Design a protein with these regions (language model features):
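Terminal, regulation- and interaction-focused segments at domain boundaries
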Residues: 1-26, 125
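Short glycine-enriched loop/turn motifs at secondary-structure junctions
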Residues: 1-2, 24, 46-49, 85
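Conserved active-site and cofactor/substrate-binding residues in soluble primary-metabolism enzymes
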Residues: 14, 35, 111, 115
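Short glycine-/small-residue-rich flexible loop motifs, especially phosphate/cofactor-binding loops
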Residues: 20, 37-38, 121
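Compact, glycine-rich, soluble single-domain proteins
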Residues: 29, 35-81
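Beta-strand/loop substructures that line and gate deep hydrophobic ligand-binding cavities in soluble
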Residues: 79-105
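Well-ordered alpha/beta subsegment
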Residues: 103-128
């Protein structure tokens, strides 16, 4: 699987408030927020569950990745998804950077991805 998943007891709105704080505790900031529900309604006229994609960045790791390989920017930021499950509880998913970086074949980026994965895993573990 190319991501890590955690089902929460929290509602979607509660999770949206908590996820940035959990990410911040591991040195990430949320750079972008894409409202998929709103975008699909506006562009296609279709209804979709509440679903947001947060673009999370850990500046020291991003800088080191870019210093290693400028093409690493294609893999940034780390996407974190928050959506409303069928039971109205929130589900949070985070990209597994080791999976996306594997395609580069760059061992230095692989090491960085392992460290970022650990931080994302810890951030998810803070959520309930």
């Amino acid at each position: 699987m190319f991501g890590m998943r955690k089902s929460l007891r929290a509602t979607y709105d509660e999770a949206l408030a908590r996820v940035p704080e959990a990410l911040k505790s591991e040195g990430f900031g949320v750079l972008t927020e894409i409202d998929i529900q709103s975008t699909l309604k506006q562009k296609l006229g279709v209804d979709f569950r509440r679903y947001k994609i947060l673009g999370a960045c850990n500046p020291p790791f991003a800088h080191e990745a870019l210093e290693t390989d400028l093409a690493a920017g294609l893999l940034l930021p780390c996407n974190v998804v928050v959506y409303e499950g069928d039971d109205r509880r929130a589900v949070v998913m985070a990209v597994d950077p080791t999976q996306t970086v594997a395609a580069t074949g760059n061992p230095k980026l692989g090491e960085l991805a392992e460290a970022v994965k650990e931080k994302l895993t810890r951030a998810l573990s803070r959520l309930e």
